[in-house]
């Protein structure tokens, strides 16, 4: 509701035709968590994904769930992507990455020219400094945050004390997600654009956003065990997960993939949500923890959640049968 109220205020303030409300959006697992795009589209708004991977999935329309936090379309081949782009944009591009990238870029730039609203997530928020930090390679977030209204939606788990902490998290995520020490861009936003170049008088609304709004999302996080909120979103756990590499994004919850997504779903939804997300798929091998930059004990969390699920009667039918056989026959068979 807060998100919609902010957008409606901007529509009225800028006298935007309600039949042509374009919103420039960057990649955000938090926005996926609350189905922000679907919700806004149901209000008649046109969402334009600016991240290349997200835009490809948006054009795909069906069976378009992301498979990695930083590489949402990494499961698609260049042949798949060429077919998606050619069909959705009525083009005849060759099966080559560069012409596909250029076609999507020109299409996105043309659409977001019509927008005065940008929405994004963030990598971290410096509570004491009053600033948010975003890391990206494509430069698309710079376009999103230059709109008249820039709305940032973030879970309360993104809060850290200082800007220095934000930078450390951004560097750590980049290293474990891409193997590089830094992304191409690190954006820090601490308010609307402004200048003091004329007699040192502070004037707002120069080139960037005229208004910046930050929405902090709880959605069950306050009740979660603290280890569930350590995640920095690098995706290294799913790359090294034997289960995820077999079943894909069926193992996880919404945009939170793998065992960590299963664990978090207990608090974002409920015990049954964690079972439906793959609570019993996990092998408890611990590869996720071993490859996690912050050593989130995901396998231990899942083991504890299984105990809770068992107490609530949320066992798999096969497990119930084994248990009953042991009780009645003294054997699982």
Write out the residue ranges for each language-model feature:
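Flexible, glycine/charged-enriched surface loops at secondary-structure junctions
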Residues: 1, 17, 176-186, 241-253, ...
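The feature marks the mature, well-folded catalytic cores of soluble enzymes
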Residues: 1-223
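Generic, well-ordered alpha-helical scaffold segments in large soluble proteins
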Residues: 6, 10, 39, 43, ...
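Residues at the N-terminus of the alpha-helix immediately C-terminal to the conserved SAM/SAH-binding loop
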Residues: 32-33, 237, 288
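Conserved hydrophobic/aromatic pocket- or pore-lining residues that grip, position, or stack substrates
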Residues: 130, 241, 333
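Ferredoxin-type iron-sulfur electron-transfer modules in oxidoreductases and energy-metabolism complexes
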Residues: 204-228, 244-331
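Phosphate-binding glycine-rich loops and their immediate beta-loop-alpha structural context
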Residues: 231
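Catalytic adenosine-cofactor/nucleotide-binding cores of aminoacyl-tRNA synthetases and other
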Residues: 234
């Amino acid at each position: 509701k807060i998100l919609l109220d902010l957008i409606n205020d901007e529509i009225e303030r800028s006298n935007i035709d309600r039949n042509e409300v374009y919103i420039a959006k960057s990649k955000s697992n938090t926005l996926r968590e609350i189905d922000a795009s679907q919700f806004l589209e149901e209000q008649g708004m046109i969402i334009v994904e600016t991240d290349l991977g997200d835009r490809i999935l948006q054009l795909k329309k069906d069976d378009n769930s992301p498979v990695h936090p930083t590489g949402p379309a990494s499961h698609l081949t260049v042949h798949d992507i060429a077919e998606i782009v050619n069909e959705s944009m009525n083009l005849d591009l060759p099966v080559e990455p560069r012409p596909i990238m250029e076609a999507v870029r020109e299409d996105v730039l043309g659409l977001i020219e019509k927008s005065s609203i940008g929405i994004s997530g963030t990598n971290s928020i410096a509570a004491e400094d009053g600033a948010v930090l975003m890391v990206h390679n494509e430069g698309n977030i710079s376009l999103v945050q230059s709109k008249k209204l820039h709305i940032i939606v973030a879970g309360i788990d993104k809060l850290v004390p200082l800007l220095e902490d934000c930078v450390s998290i951004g560097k750590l995520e980049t290293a474990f997600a891409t193997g590089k020490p830094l992304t191409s861009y690190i954006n820090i936003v601490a308010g609307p654009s402004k200048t003091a170049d004329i007699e040192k008088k502070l004037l707002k609304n120069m080139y960037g956003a005229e208004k910046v709004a930050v929405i902090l999302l709880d959605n069950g996080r306050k009740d979660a065990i603290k280890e569930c909120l350590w995640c920095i979103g690098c995706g290294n756990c799913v790359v090294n997960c034997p289960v995820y590499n077999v079943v894909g994004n069926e193992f996880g919850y919404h945009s939170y993939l793998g065992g960590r997504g299963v664990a978090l779903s207990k608090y974002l939804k409920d015990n049954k949500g964690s079972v439906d997300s793959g609570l019993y798929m996990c092998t408890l091998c611990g590869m996720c923890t071993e490859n996690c930059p912050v050593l989130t004990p995901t396998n231990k969390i899942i083991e504890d959640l299984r105990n809770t699920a068992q107490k609530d009667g949320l066992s798999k039918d096969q497990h119930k049968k084994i248990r009953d056989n042991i009780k009645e026959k003294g054997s699982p068979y």
